[in-house]
């Protein structure tokens, strides 16, 4: 069992801030899992499929990025050192691309396009909250955001441009790029990102839903890129 990804508020559902990505996970499969245990290590929803495959006695394809949680329960491995997150805003009308990575204390967010965050704007306009000092930061976020989740759990103080946090920023960014390479992420290519960005912004009125046989152009582009690799 996992919950939905946060409340429908600014910086919550649909975003990659903690209130939109940190959710409970419950496993109940006796006797395959120990009962009454609480795992404090980090896991991800990408671990669900490998877990189910192993429980069913099916081999786990090597290309899957997740791992079976049975290994965690049996003490064969520790929780993840890094958790990766990503969003496009879930629909063209809410489009905003964000990449994220966190370790047990720090989180780095990469916003490749410095423009209005349509997802954040929609959540704000439809809420009854009064404007405050944090509104501008999530409506027009910096290219990089770095947060100390221990001392700043609500992610308000951006440390990404402070000299003393430069090494942590570089470490997390390198790990993010490494993971993208490992999973053959088409968005590792800036050209692919630009195509997708332009395409989504052109369809914000979602009129494509009325077009018979409509196909997103970026799908063919990404397939071609994978074949060429």
Description of each model-found segment:
Residues 49-53, 57, 70, 98, ...:
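Non-transmembrane alpha-helical segments in soluble domains
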Residues 10-79, 157:
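Substrate-binding rim/cap in mid-to-C-terminal beta-strand-loop elements of soluble/periplasmic
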Residues 7, 56-145, 183, 200-202:
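C-terminal cap/loop subdomain of S1 sulfatases and analogous C-terminal strand-loop tails that border
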Residues 22, 139-143, 149-151, 159-229:
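Long, internal low-complexity/basic segments
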Residues 43-50, 64-67, 103, 141-144, ...:
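A structural signal for well-ordered alpha-helical segments within the folded catalytic domains
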């Amino acid at each position: 069992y996992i919950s939905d990804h946060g409340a429908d508020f600014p910086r919550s559902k649909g975003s990659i801030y903690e209130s939109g990505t940190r959710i409970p996970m419950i496993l109940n499969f006796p006797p395959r899992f120990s009962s009454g245990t609480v795992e404090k290590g980090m896991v991800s929803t990408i671990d669900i499929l490998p877990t189910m495959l192993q429980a069913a006695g099916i081999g786990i394809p090597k290309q899957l990025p997740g791992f079976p949680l049975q290994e965690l329960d049996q003490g064969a491995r520790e929780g993840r050192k890094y958790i990766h997150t990503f969003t496009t805003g879930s629909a063209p009308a809410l489009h905003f691309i964000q990449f994220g990575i966190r370790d047990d204390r720090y989180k780095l967010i990469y916003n490749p396009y410095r423009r209005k965050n349509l997802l954040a704007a929609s959540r704000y306009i439809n809420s009854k909250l009064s404007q405050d000092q944090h509104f501008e930061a999530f409506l027009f976020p910096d290219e990089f955001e770095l947060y100390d989740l221990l001392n700043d759990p609500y992610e308000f103080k951006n440390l990404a441009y402070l000299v003393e946090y430069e090494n942590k920023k570089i470490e997390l960014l390198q790990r993010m790029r490494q993971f993208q390479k490992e999973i053959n992420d088409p968005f590792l290519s800036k050209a692919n990102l630009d195509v997708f960005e332009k395409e989504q912004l052109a369809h914000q009125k979602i009129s494509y839903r009325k077009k018979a046989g409509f196909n997103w152009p970026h799908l063919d582009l990404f397939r071609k890129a994978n074949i060429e690799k």
